[in-house]
């Protein structure tokens, strides 16, 4: 997978890709990530990427021109499966979406700022709009990082144990149940006996039951899907 991120704050994005799972994926050659500073594509001396909204109102709006030039440049070099805009009014990211999107080859992620981008960007360039929740952040960079992490960990070969991703919360619309590790008895707080029984069929059944109960208590809406 190749991910091209368009941003006005590339320095905000770099460090998460230099550690942990995302770094491992890059080092293995399983994913390529590139940052494109939108200010490099402006045609004005000030390198500004925003202007006042037509009709007045609070805030600034990101210009069409630098976004057009950046996306057009990238598309001249390769084909992209999706051009994604991170925005609070997009479809809310979920596990089903990341499962399917992890199979894509090349994607562009546009990080918004200020009041957002000129609507013509959304009309003519964006193929998918994604939100990470019903709240507003200072920019789309943190949302882009969430999306990247959620996608990259699903790429085959990234996790040392590929079955780990398949048993995460939200797979099969269930939250993960309780998990335990050693010691089996700590200050009298004991691990459920079934988990140390060695009876794998019973363990699987216990985990399924716990996942269902946990989901019913915490996120009953998931069971309606």
Curated annotation (Swiss-Prot):
GO BP annotation list: tRNA N1-guanine methylation
Location relative to the cell: Cytoplasm
CDD domains: TrmD-like
Alphabetical list of Pfam families matching this protein: tRNA_m1G_MT
GO cellular component: cytosol
Xref: Gene3D superfamilies: 3.40.1280.10, tRNA(m1g37)methyltransferase, domain 2
Main location: cytoplasm
InterPro entries to which the protein is assigned, alphabetical: Alpha/beta_knot_MTases (IPR029028), tRNA_m1G_MeTrfase_C_sf (IPR023148), tRNA_m1G_MeTrfase_TrmD (IPR002649), tRNA_m1G_MTases_N (IPR029026), tRNA_MeTrfase_TRMD/TRM10 (IPR016009)
GO molecular function terms attached to this record: tRNA (guanine(37)-N1)-methyltransferase activity
Entry keywords, A to Z: Cytoplasm, Methyltransferase, S-adenosyl-L-methionine, Transferase, tRNA processing
Enzyme class: transferase
Reaction catalyzed: guanosine(37) in tRNA + S-adenosyl-L-methionine = N(1)-methylguanosine(37) in tRNA + S-adenosyl-L-homocysteine + H(+)
SUPFAM superfamilies according to UniProt: alpha/beta knot
EC code: 2.1.1.228
Role played: Specifically methylates guanosine-37 in various tRNAs.
Family to which this protein belongs: Belongs to the RNA methyltransferase TrmD family.
Protein name: tRNA (guanine-N(1)-)-methyltransferase
